[in-house]
Amino acid sequence: MSNDSKFFTNQKGDDLASRINELAKYSKSFDVLSGFFYSSGFYQIYKSLEDTDSIRILIGISTNEETFTLINQGNKLQEDKILNEPEVLEKVEDQVESEMQNSDDSKLVEMGVHKFIEWIRSGKLVIKAYPSQNIHAKLYIWTFKEGDREKGTVITGSSNLTQSGLINNLEFNVELKDRNDYEFAKDKFEELWKDSIDVSQKYVETVEE
């Protein structure tokens, strides 16, 4: 891998989307933990993931401005609430509908959505939602193909899986290449993934309604 930079701020050509696309060339799996997710962000990276075997996206469910503001204002009850499965599915449905209706670039969203659905149906991609509304972590984990000199790498920081987070906003993200960092991040992701709710089919149903 030619890019040895550790920090990505979306300035001067070091946007996070470009690094994701570079690392995807070497990856057999890609795991994402993101508080916010929009299909326009997925559009920025999906082409490089064509040869990736497995993609898992774990999202928070506090994905609208109103809820995010409430949490930032210290609404402890809202922050700590654990939702049941029907409530999680309803929130995901609301999020997808809102994006489709309010996106500034509906064509990009549409292209990202079509690929997203295709990969869900093939089993390549699974999206889950964490049932607690206090998850705001951002984590990108690549597991490399066998024979690579490293097992994997991790990027963590401020960027959500959105076009703004990957390209437009001033962000601060760091790549961690140490094996111990990769293993720690992978283990924590697996813990959260196990306790999360599969919303893949709800995503497809909402888009196709």
Can you say where each PLM-predicted feature lies in the sequence?
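PLD/PLD-like phosphodiesterase catalytic module centered on the HKD motif
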Residues: 1-209
